[in-house]
Swiss-Prot record:
Keyword terms: Membrane, Transmembrane, Transmembrane helix
Membrane topology: Multi-pass membrane protein
GO biological process: cellular response to alkaline pH; cellular response to lithium ion; cellular response to neutral pH; cellular response to pH; cellular response to starvation; filamentous growth; filamentous growth of a population of unicellular organisms in response to neutral pH; filamentous growth of a population of unicellular organisms in response to pH
Transmembrane segments: 4-24, 106-126, 191-211, 219-239
Coiled-coil stretches noted in the UniProt entry, renumbered to this chain: none
Family that this chain belongs to: Belongs to the palI/RIM9 family.
Cytoplasmic side: 1-3, 127-190, 240-346
Gene name tied to this protein: RIM9
Biological role stated in the UniProt entry: Required for the proteolytic cleavage of the transcription factor RIM101 in response to alkaline ambient pH.
Name of protein: pH-response regulator protein palI/RIM9
Species this chain originates from: Candida albicans (strain SC5314 / ATCC MYA-2876)
Principal place of residence: membrane
Amino acid sequence: MFKAFIALLILLIVCWVIQLLPVIAVPFTTPDANIYLSYYNNYKFGVFGICNVERHICSKPSIGYPSTNSTFYAYDNDESFGTGGIVLPSDVRYTISKLLVVHVVAFCFSSLLLIVIFGLIIILFFKYIKTKKDLEGIQLNDSSHEITIHSDEEDNNNNNIDNTNHNNKRASVTINKTIFDLTPFLNLMLVFTFFSVLTTLLAFLADILLFTPNLSYLGWLQLIPIVSMALVTSMLCFIKRSISSRKFFESEYRYANDDMRIMRKTYVDEFWNDNASDDGFYVYTDGFYTRNGDNVQQPTSNTAGSLLSEHHDVSIVEPRTFLDTDDSRRGSSPHEFIELQNLRPV
């Protein structure tokens, strides 16, 4: 279980880094940096603004690209702006650029998910250390009780054995009761992964809608968090299912509908017990040979020639040897058999 959470942590760190790149794109980085969602008409587009590559002028970070009355156009007077502000690669209006804020929402959900799983791993690590120390203490108590047992008398030995068994049972019960319940954390992680997948998918669709002819590598990289988050969701569901099944089978209480536990116990018993399906019926055979005492004869083939040559009026030959009706001898020797020969009538 601990290794599974570490694998999830590594996968989430990769997704978190990929989702961080669009958030820190231009205008937070310089225009010379290779972190942008699209490059079109000497302009680099990010989530919170745009930058002019030639003049090294960037807009102020804001949700949505600068409108027609923005001061950005006063510093960068370009005829390509027209009357509607900045021209996007897909020729859509600049107001649709506000959809890019979904990148930030997806990044926030991934950050929360990363914090939860990192905290869960730390808690499990400390719980493992504490449980290990408790088990070592129990083993030390057992060894000390064994030393005192050898030095006492027989009556005292019995009392000490009972006390040690009672203490061991109490210690094991307390350790079992302090087992950490992962279900609330798993439910919280499932909620975060679900919303992270939805928001990352919506952000990728917004990138395609705005920059579809000139979408950069950073936009296509957003497919990796989508697939990874879907994989993380499946793994979390599998872990939750395995934990709930283990708790159900290891529970000491009986339930009203306990068919699942009974079926599992029956299957395990039949799997480990070789005599589980034994009904007392034995079949002895020598393959395709006929044994008469110590003489072994191969059977004759019932061909048409042999049937014509060995023609009889009866179709069934009387058995040579019958099994004894005595119960004490029934099935005692594999040499006792009934030999029958099938003859076809002419």
